[in-house]
Amino acid sequence: MLEPPKSYNEMLPMLHKATFITTFIFYLSLVIYGYMPLVGINAKYIPPVKDYEEFIKWILTFGILPIASSVFWSVISGVLDLHNNVAKIIGIRKMWDSHLIIKPLAKIAGVTRKLTTDESHKVMSKLYYPEVKELKDKHYVELFWNKVYYFWVFFEHTVIAFVTILIISIAKLTNIFSVTGSLINLWLWIISLVAFDFLIFIASVKPRTESQVRQIPDSKIKEFFNNNNIF
């Protein structure tokens, strides 16, 4: 999980595993500090796993919620493509593609106007992705995925933490279950995560994206725009 991926397809299973681990640690902390109830499980329902009995028993001393929630969010991460869909909903993907990829490519081609949605889609799917895939110097691609992977890990954790803390806040206000911890600390954690995500994006993801775009030959960019009548 700590070894960075070399492609998007390599990144996905690693991201799901990272989501499982970060979620488990997060929910474990929530139980320890009184934000979530300790929901026990009868020992007879614990399957015998050789060499891991003590470890499993230790995990379950904190209740079933941390491990169950980790499994749940890891599945959601994979089935719903959580990082990608949330990023689209809140506009991160559009901003990323538009300002860091499409606009620089259009500038090289001498196009200063804003591209239409169809033109933008064509530039991404027919020019950017194919050309990046064919880059001979994979160093730039690997550096890109190195930074993007960690950004998505923290981004998914931020999304999961936000949803969880929202539920906890509602639960405390409506007395659905006992919450002894301070809600202020939880929302400060969300603010810290958002700030950290922004820092990673600006300091690492942005320059790596721009660097990768620059590896596409100017001649191919201009040829693509001319052939597709994007002026």
Where are these predicted regions, by residue range?
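Terminal transmembrane helical module of multi-pass membrane proteins
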Residues: 164, 168-174, 182, 192, ...
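Intrinsic-disorder/low-complexity regions
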Residues: 136, 184, 196, 217, ...
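Charged, low-complexity, helix-prone segments enriched in Lys/Glu/Asp/Gln
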Residues: 141-163, 185-190, 194-215
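Charge-rich cytosolic interhelical loops and cytosolic tails of multi-pass membrane proteins
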Residues: 79-146
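N-terminal first transmembrane alpha-helix
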Residues: 1-108, 177-196, 203-212
